[in-house]
Amino acid sequence: VDAVEDSDEARTRAQKAEAALYRVYGDNNLEQLDLETEIDCAILGDACYKVIWDTTEKKVRVTAPDVQGIYAWWLGDDTSQMWRVASKYSLSAEETELLYQAKPKGKTATIVELWTARDFELYLDNALVEKKPNPYGFIPFIIYSNLREPKKFWGISDLPQIMESQRELNRAMSQLSRILELSGNPIAVLENVEESENIAIRPGAVWNIPEDARAYLLDLLQGGGISLHINYIDLLYRTLHDISESPRSAFGGIERDISGVALEIELNPLLQKVRRKRIIRSVVYKRRNEMILKLLEKYRGEDFGDNHLRIVWGPVLPQDVARQVNNEQTLVQTGIHSRRTAMDEIGIRDPECEFKRWLEERETILRMNKELNAKSTKSGARERASLSQAEGVEE
């Protein structure tokens, strides 16, 4: 959280807003919620957050409703402007009576919440139960896509593009498994034998066959045929990794030592995919933080001022911390970066608090140095006085 105005009061309010966000994140376990929501988003193609005020516990509540029950209306061709959102979900009769003081006719009830920026409507089994002005002044839902299709509101899942390759890989693996199973239970072949009975294939078995007959076991692996199946499976693996933009090296499949730049080039498809997703998520998390601060200002009377919210992402690849620190040190010394910006880039969670600690340590060290210098000055003066007195006595 960065203050828009350049004043001590504005910076204090920005620090207060950042601390409030950290508390809400901790109260709602948002790190775990974000992980679960991201998995749902990758599978379903879309995800949703709901930010409301919990009147019972008097705090901000952040949840992730099932996006399959979310319906949205947007303005014309501008898919970023939602003017109405409906949330549909089912509750048991006991839950319905506990939450809404209404007893449904059946064992379950269908609840529909209809939100606009001005109004809120609640339906229970298609019957209007409550209608009132929106207490928040905004729609408390944030709907976002996994990967957005051009000019469409709803996104696409990561699964359809890899499903065909995965099915073919499963078929090839099953075929190879059957071949290996048959080779482990070989088939006995008897030539020039008109009839046979009680022929068992086991260690030490003795077969009595005519003089001109021949017996042998059918080897399904001879001639290198099994290698064709293995090569085809490797080809499917490569296709699967290429389509999903996740190179094999992302799973620790590097069998040679390479430099950091070479690793970054090899993982570039995955980095581009992560970057596309982060662009979408940055807007979502920023909007969620804005909703949290608005609810705290409305219901707790807080005043956070006018601030600029930023999302700081961690590095995807392992970083050379020593090199990064040296680069930031040079940027700070040349006046290009401030100390707080350098801390942000390195990954310090709370740069403002860390900067305060640095100032306190610096002030303590300077005070100790002054005290030591003062003591050494007094000691030197005493030694000089003692020497002067000794010289006077000798004379």
Which residues fall in each region the model found?
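Short, Φ-rich (hydrophobic/aromatic) sequence segments
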Residues: 1-2, 33-42, 159-176, 281
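Conserved aromatic-histidine-acidic binding/catalytic patches
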Residues: 1-5, 9, 37, 157, ...
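Structured, mid-chain assembly/scaffold modules that mediate subunit interfaces
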Residues: 1-139, 292, 296-303
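Short coil/turn segments at secondary-structure boundaries
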Residues: 2-4, 34-40, 51-54, 180-192, ...
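A broad, structural surface signal
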Residues: 19-30, 43, 54, 167, ...
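Short low-polarity hydrophobic stretches
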Residues: 49, 166-169, 342
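Extended, charged amphipathic alpha-helical segments
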Residues: 122-265
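C-terminal helix-loop subdomains that flank or include functional centers
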Residues: 194-195, 201-216, 220, 227-228, ...
